[in-house]
Structure formats: C-alpha cells, structure tokens
C-alpha cells in the first residue's frame, strides 16, 4: 500500500484544484461532464504543486520508468518522471509510435481499443508507475498495466490527478494500487 498522498491533507491544494478544474458539460458526448485540467496546467505554481503531490508517494519506491497514457497522461507523466529521476515512456493509441511496438487490446462499452508501447521501452524487472489525468472505468489503465507486465516490468502503482469513483475504476485496478489527488 502506498503512503497517503500528502496533498490530501493540504486543503489549500485541494481547494485550488477544485477552483481551477473546469467542468465542460456534454463533452465529448451529450450527458458527459468533462473535467478539463488545462486551467491547472496553465498555472505554473499550481501545476508544480500538483507534480510534487503526485510524485511524493512514490519517492523511495525506486521507480525506474513512468508510463504516461495518451494524451493528458503525457503532460503529467513526463514531469513526474523527472521528479522521480525515472525515464518516461508514452503509451499511445495503436499505430502512433514510429518504432516496433507491442499492442494490448481492451474492450469498451461498444467495441474495443488498444494501447501500445515500443517493444524496448521497458526492460525486464524495471519498476513502473502508470500515470494519467483521470481514472474513469480503469480499462485503459488496466490494459497499460498488462502491457507493462508483458514487457517485463513490475507495476509499482497507478497515479491519477482525479478519479471518478462512481465509474468503479479504483475497484477494477485495486484500490491499494491507486493514488489520486481528487475524487469525484
């Protein structure tokens, strides 16, 4: 189990995040309320505090690679990798990487999708943290974790800026492996 995220007791950070996150109704489809993180990214002090808080539980966990899930996971994962002195690996939609890659498919409500990484992105035994902005159902994160395992990595955990707990993502991934700053 990961230590508690320091910022969860930092009511100022939580309040600042809640003030800056923007709800966009009916995006990308009618009935969905999209959590827009771009106002957080636009504020350098707040963005820095977010990266510090997201990386804090994993300091001392010997993370060697941080996998950022396309696309907003890149924006959080790369600076978290720097903060942890780890390498960064992008997990992309199939067909987007230039070198030989490995794909992991997963089911959606209506159809399927996939995530891919370069076949040499993670070495045997590397300790890997998976990062994304929002945890919803957990399908993409779960597929990314399977891909990490197929490539020989050891999953340290998952880290998200926010979790939509009503969609059951933390239960799917295993709550003890999931760290988030905000829960909705």
UniProtKB/Swiss-Prot annotation:
GO molecular function list: adenine binding; adenine phosphoribosyltransferase activity; AMP binding
Binding partners and assembly: Homodimer.
Name of the featured protein: Adenine phosphoribosyltransferase
EC number assigned by the record: 2.4.2.7
GO biological process, one term: AMP salvage
Protein's organism: Myxococcus xanthus (strain DK1622)
Pathway assigned to this chain's UniProt record: Purine metabolism; AMP biosynthesis via salvage pathway; AMP from adenine: step 1/1
Record NCBIfam families: apt, PRK02304.1-3, PRK02304.1-5
């Amino acid at each position: 189990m990961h230590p508690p995220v320091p910022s969860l007791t930092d009511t100022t950070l939580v309040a600042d995040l809640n003030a800056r996150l923007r709800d966009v109704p009916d995006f990308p489809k009618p009935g969905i309320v999209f959590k827009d993180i771009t106002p957080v990214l636009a504020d350098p002090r707040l963005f820095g505090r977010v990266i510090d808080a997201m990386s804090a539980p994993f300091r001392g966990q010997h993370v060697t690679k941080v996998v950022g899930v396309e696309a907003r996971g890149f924006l959080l994962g790369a600076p978290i990798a720097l903060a942890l002195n780890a390498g960064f690996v992008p997990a992309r939609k199939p067909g987007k990487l230039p070198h030989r890659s490995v794909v992991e498919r997963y089911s959606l409500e209506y159809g399927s999708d996939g995530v891919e990484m370069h076949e040499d992105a993670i070495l045997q035994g590397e300790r890997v943290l998976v990062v994304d902005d929002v945890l919803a159902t957990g399908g993409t994160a779960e597929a990314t974790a399977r891909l990490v395992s197929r490539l020989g990595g050891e999953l340290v955990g998952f880290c998200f800026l926010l979790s939509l707990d009503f969609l059951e993502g933390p239960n799917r991934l295993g709550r003890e492996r999931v760290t988030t700053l905000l829960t909705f």
